[in-house]
């Protein structure tokens, strides 16, 4: 039986239009989030405490300068009882502590040996709370280590030491931070911040570098979203080194840092409804 080519072309055209619509809606969401990006300012954080640890791979010394600033927004209120309950839950990362993670810098320790130092900046009131409560202090150090590991693809030892006689190692660099948090990440009440990620699953994903060898030109994220029938339910936010994805209603939640800086404005997202895979192609910024 002969097949009407015009019918096939019509179906293909309709599918192509639908895919383009999905992509346009997703990119409109990305563009709105980027255009709504709050202003940023350069701050010089105040000293707080200094934590000594080491890199698991080469055993070299690493120091964390946990600093404080009133410019960084505080996390939602959390009592000690709620913190204990949170730490015993399946997903302690559901409670977010806003923080600015600085670039690594090389310093010289008391033994005249070179070491790597990271500056972590948190809200000053929350820092004072952690300073008075050992459990909160341990929690703060844990989330700081995890944040650095995610952002810089590190593995840091949990065998730590808080230095008693110094509040920072080397010098504390200025940092460029947002003056107001993005709604998708920070402006949620304490109840939502504790329930959203536990209800939403972390999707499976892969990160690919193109080309596979040589200088990286593109970073490609492929995120599997089974059960998501349309891009309309996706909220995607790209930062210079971060990807945040929410699939409504509370289906998936992904928040990852990249080991490289990306060009948000020229990034492209496509959602394939057949494979239920979101592909985000991001140009790598040359340093």
Curated annotation (Swiss-Prot):
Keywords: Nucleus, Transcription, Transcription regulation. Its main location: nucleus. Pfam families: PIH1, PIH1_CS. One of its GO terms (cellular component) is nucleus. The keyword Nucleus applies. GO terms for biological process: axonemal dynein complex assembly; box C/D snoRNP assembly; rRNA processing. The keyword Nuclease does not apply. It is found in: Nucleus. Involved in the assembly of C/D box small nucleolar ribonucleoprotein (snoRNP) particles. Recruits the SWI/SNF complex to the core promoter of rRNA genes and enhances pre-rRNA transcription. Mediates interaction of TELO2 with the R2TP complex which is necessary for the stability of MTOR and SMG1. Positively regulates the assembly and activity of the mTORC1 complex. Belongs to the PIH1 family. This is PIH1 domain-containing protein 1. It comes from Danio rerio. The lineage of its organism: Eukaryota, Metazoa, Chordata, Craniata, Vertebrata.
